């Protein structure tokens, strides 16, 4: 086992924060990283939202978007963008053929959760794909299991306890199969407010920090936290994408980045959460300015979302042409912003990942 013991200020060694990782998990984490030990991964596991966007572009009912169309879109994104990424996140429902099209340099993560959430009851409760397991994900050649849950510390204790138990089960399953567990949590307003608006932006730091503080705990056995940036850059006064309404000054925003990083005892990477490429790049610049020890990104729609309309209206060849031009420019802009990222091995205290 690889591990690290943290020293107290007095110099004595204590083990209550002992972190370890199996050789099997370590091998897979290396496969997901670039030469510097940074995770610069692309995300293409969208399902429900992708179907809706393609349907809108085609002017058809969502049921007219076939599994073949979904696979075709995912395969094009994978083939064109993975030469510029350390890994790709796909889903077992429509993405297994796409996984075969990835560049030889790129590792593979597979989603384990059902798309969306249970909307028949409060709390945005998650569920697993019924024909998938951590073992099957590993057998399909993946280097990591990814789970997305919707989470906020401000929901009821009962709802959050269901989610805690859910993640404990997945963590144990991944641990047994020696495959890394990437946990993505996306915040929401239990009262139904607009998560892209000013009022949610004001509480977003507490949502992100509280979520990171919870799921960094050892009982969840998460290896990498896939997190939202703790602020909405459109409401950061003076940011490159500032829209005029202030939720925080730049100094306050940088403080939120630092506090979020401080609570994480596990490596964490940022997700793009559907924002524009410019907004995500600005968010990464703020992370670097704040001095946070994030270990990379898993970037999806900020790279390829404009391609959905092109595919829907003009087909796969037009999509591939767009990806080869603007899509590559988008992913390279993200890669260029990763200069301040910290290798995950350093966060784990195990030295170089090589």
Language model feature labels by segment:
Residues 73-79, 127-144, 152, 159-160, ...:
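Alpha/beta enzyme core
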Residues 163, 167-188, 293-308, 312:
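Amphipathic alpha-helical packing elements
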Residues 229, 272-273, 301:
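Short secondary-structure boundary segments
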Residues 17-157, 221, 245-249, 266-267, ...:
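Alpha/beta catalytic barrel-like cores
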Residues 261, 266-267, 273:
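Long, repeat-rich segments with strong aromatic
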Residues 6-18:
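Short, Lys/Arg-enriched N-terminal segments with co-localized hydrophobic residues
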């Amino acid at each position: 086992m690889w591990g690290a013991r943290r020293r107290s200020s007095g110099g004595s060694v204590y083990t209550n924060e002992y972190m370890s990782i199996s050789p099997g998990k370590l091998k897979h984490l290396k496969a997901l990283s670039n030469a510097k030990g940074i995770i610069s991964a692309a995300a293409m596991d969208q399902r429900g939202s992708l179907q809706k966007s393609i349907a809108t572009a085609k002017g058809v009912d969502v049921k007219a978007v076939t599994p073949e169309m979904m696979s075709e879109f995912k395969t094009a994104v994978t083939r064109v963008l993975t030469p510029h990424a350390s890994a790709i996140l796909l889903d077992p429902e429509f993405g297994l053929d796409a996984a075969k099209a990835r560049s030889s340099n790129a590792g593979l993560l597979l989603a384990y959760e059902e798309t969306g959430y249970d909307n028949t009851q409060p709390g945005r409760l998650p569920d697993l794909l019924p024909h998938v397991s951590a073992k099957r994900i590993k057998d399909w050649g993946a280097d990591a299991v990814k789970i997305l849950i919707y989470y906020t510390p401000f929901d009821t204790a009962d709802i959050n306890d269901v989610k805690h138990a859910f993640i404990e089960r997945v963590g144990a399953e991944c641990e047994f199969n020696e495959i890394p567990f990437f946990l993505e949590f996306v915040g929401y307003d239990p009262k139904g407010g607009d998560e892209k608006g000013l009022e949610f932006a004001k509480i977003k730091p507490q949502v992100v920090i509280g979520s990171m503080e919870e799921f960094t705990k050892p009982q969840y056995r998460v290896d990498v936290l896939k997190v939202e940036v703790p602020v909405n850059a459109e409401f950061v006064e003076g940011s490159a994408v500032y829209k005029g309404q202030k939720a925080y000054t730049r100094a306050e925003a940088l403080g939120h980045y630092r506090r979020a990083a401080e609570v994480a005892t596990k490596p964490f990477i940022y997700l793009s959460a559907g924002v524009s490429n410019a907004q995500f790049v600005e968010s990464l610049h703020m992370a670097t300015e704040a001095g946070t020890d994030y270990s990379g990104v898993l970037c999806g729609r900020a790279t390829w979302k404009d391609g959905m309309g092109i595919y829907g209206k003009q087909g796969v060849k037009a999509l591939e042409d767009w990806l080869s031009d603007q899509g590559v420019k988008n992913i390279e802009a993200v890669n260029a912003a990763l200069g301040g990222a910290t290798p995950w091995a350093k966060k784990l205290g195990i030295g170089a990942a090589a």
